[in-house]
């Protein structure tokens, strides 16, 4: 579902490339639990990494202008920001040149990396047009509880790590239910079973040491007319 984008001059553009994509031994899947406010990267049914996240503070679903986080089966359609520095601000998926530190007062833009999602089911078919992303946020103190405008927010450190571990087209499952038991056990063992206290930035994700896939573009994405939610 997610297109992989080329890296050029610190800006990602979707285009063809002659570089081959490395193939992992098993397909990876992203599972996002609204109840747990966590994202698990799974491979062959086992967790590779577990990260705290923040989903919508408004609702769940795919209704236009609702600021809801969509549920169901999706995939990564685009990867944007490959060479951007930590805290790089994006507007309309383009870097502005501004860089923000974590928890910059009064600021809530999209930062660091963008994984643009597209839906695969009737109930999330508007996801791409609604500009729903997995992305970095400077509001890292809100990670671990619902606080977004529909997107799935991560710390800058965590979104870079996830970005580097998956190719475009990676399957995503967003569910109201809890993470798989193996991922919950992983998180408990690594001390990531609870949300951070108010005003605190969550600890970095605990990840397994596995090879990271090379990114490869899979062609341009057709432009859509869409509504752009403020600071998802």
Regions flagged by a language model, labelled:
Residues 1-2:
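Bacterial N-terminal signal peptides that target proteins for export
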Residues 10-13:
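C-terminal motif of bacterial Sec signal peptides marking the signal peptidase cleavage site
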Residues 18-60:
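A structural motif detector for short, solvent-exposed N-terminal "entry" segments of globular domains
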Residues 18-20, 64-66, 84-232:
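Exported/periplasmic cell-wall-interacting domains
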Residues 26, 47, 70, 109-111, ...:
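A short, polar/charged loop/turn motif at coil->beta-strand junctions and beta-hairpin connectors
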Residues 29-33, 38-40, 50-52, 75-77, ...:
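Soluble periplasmic/extracytoplasmic beta-strand elements of cell-envelope proteins
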Residues 52-84:
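Electropositive
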């Amino acid at each position: 579902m997610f297109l992989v984008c080329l890296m050029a001059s610190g800006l990602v553009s979707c285009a063809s490339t002659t570089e081959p994509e490395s193939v992992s031994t098993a397909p990876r899947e992203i599972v996002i639990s609204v109840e747990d406010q966590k994202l698990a990267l799974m491979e062959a049914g086992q967790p590779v990494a577990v990260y705290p996240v923040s989903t919508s503070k408004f609702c769940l679903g795919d209704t236009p202008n609702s600021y809801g986080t969509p549920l169901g089966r999706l995939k990564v359609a685009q990867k944007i920001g490959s060479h951007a520095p930590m805290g790089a601000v994006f507007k309309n998926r383009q870097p502005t040149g501004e860089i923000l530190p974590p928890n910059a007062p009064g600021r809530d833009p999209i930062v660091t990396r963008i994984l643009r999602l597209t839906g695969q089911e009737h109930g999330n078919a508007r996801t791409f047009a609604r500009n729903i992303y997995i992305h970095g946020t400077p509001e890292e103190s809100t990670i671990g509880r619902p606080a977004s405008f529909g997107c799935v927010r991560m710390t800058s450190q965590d979104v870079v790590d996830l970005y580097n571990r998956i190719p475009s087209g990676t399957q995503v499952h967003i569910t109201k239910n809890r993470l798989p038991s193996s991922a919950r056990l992983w998180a408990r063992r690594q001390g990531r079973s609870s949300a951070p206290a108010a005003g605190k930035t969550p600890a970095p994700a605990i990840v397994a040491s596995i090879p990271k896939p090379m990114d490869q573009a899979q062609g341009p994405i057709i432009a859509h007319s869409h509504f752009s939610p403020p600071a998802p």
